[in-house]
Amino acid sequence: MSAESHPTLPPVRLHSDAELARDALGAPLFARAVRLARWAGPATRVGVGGELVADQLPAAAAHLGLDAGDEDAAGYASQAWRVAVDTGLVDVAEPEEDADAEGPGEAGEEPHGTAAPGEDLALVTAGAPGDVLGLWRAALETVLADAAVPDLEDLVDALDEGGEIDFDRLDWNPGREADFLDEVLANLYLLTVAEGGTADRQIPLPVLAASMVVPDGMGEPTDAVLEQVSDAMMRLDDQFRQLEPIGLVDFRPVDEELMAQADEDAPRGDLAADEEDVSRYGMVRLTPLGLYGIRARMLEAGVDAPAVGELAGKGADALLDAVSSYPEHAAQVEIEQWMAGREPADAVAELLSAARGDDEGGPLRRLRCQQALALAGPEAEPAVRSVLDEAELGGLARVWLAEHGAADVPAPAPEMVFWLTVDTIAAQLAADGETEELPLLMETLTAHHTGFFDQVWRVEHPSTVQVLEAMGRLHPDRKRAKEARRAAFKARSRRP
């Protein structure tokens, strides 16, 4: 996942490291890896690459409590062992390359290496939560690498006459497959944080598959695109089954009956298009641990993936700059945490100072500042009164004082009213674009000012032209909209 393909994301609400570490230790695959690491000893034999020799897999599976009659038990044990080795929970000494077949074992045996609990195993019980999470992230990388590998059936189909894998026939590119899975997880993360930033939203598999396949701006998908969505769904169904045991996701697989239909004669597009019961087509949810893990990988890739609360120790300038790009609810949560750790009067003074500026981001900073001031009580009044005479802040200061029933609030000059109107609409345009509510706001702000558009074009605000052009498009009163367009023309003519 690249930083270029993912601009600043909404903030995610993470559980504490202690809670996440408990989740990691409870993830089935990680827990099995820990148990096998403790099981490893002098009698443990490994082959080249550190894998358990085949005749020890039944004993490993039995130690894990897996059903001996389950044909997948040996595979589960092998995967858990590989995770233990890759994370450093187990140290292996591979067989010497020139070892004689009769060296370490009986005559005719393949040479083998040895294994023992690794130094990192102690971190599971004696390490800090961050140590446990570091081990879990290493385990996650192993599982992600496995999930990007074709399944056994595809590998068998790609064998040539000599028993070697024909990669051209397989049409498998390791880098491409890893990039695909990275993008899937990044999209899943984005879909999750866009709705509040918590791990409680299930995403239908067709929605996630479509996000990978359907071109931006496409209206009705073509049959060819729907078939690509169906293929992507089947691919993701297999991958999420592999990712669930490490605790990354909660996954409801595609209904087996639908899988059978897809394998028979049902049109492939129908698999993605039928909305009768979307849950039958698979549902996936990033767990709290999954949100943590994917965010950590995105940060390593240079993606700006903020977390709620990480601005609490920074200044008001950093706070307002950051929350200006957040959805309103996420901004509110971040502001509340920032305010909670400060003296209200000092916090308000710092916020007002940071809200100044005639740059492009100024209106939205002042909107978020106003959002923060709503949390302050009477103790903030002196700091608010101190900016009453300022063109940029005097308007919002009067609004706050009026809302709090303060006495002796001076009436604003007409120029300040016009300036505040432009600033308010500019902030709304920057925050949400041309929403359905914006025309009503425009009507409300201009209704009580006779000759509003005869005056507002003279306002010395960097967004005057942009605001008037928007009012010309959106104002619900056609006469007022025409006046706004004329005012925008006058405002443009004043610019050098």
Regions inferred by a protein language model and the residue ranges of each:
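Short amphipathic alpha-helical interaction segments
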Residues: 71-86, 228-255
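C-terminal engagement modules used by replication, chromatin/transcription, nuclear envelope/ESCRT
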Residues: 242, 248-309
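Structural detector for internal amphipathic alpha-helices that build alpha-solenoid repeat scaffolds
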Residues: 210-213, 321-325, 331-342, 353, ...
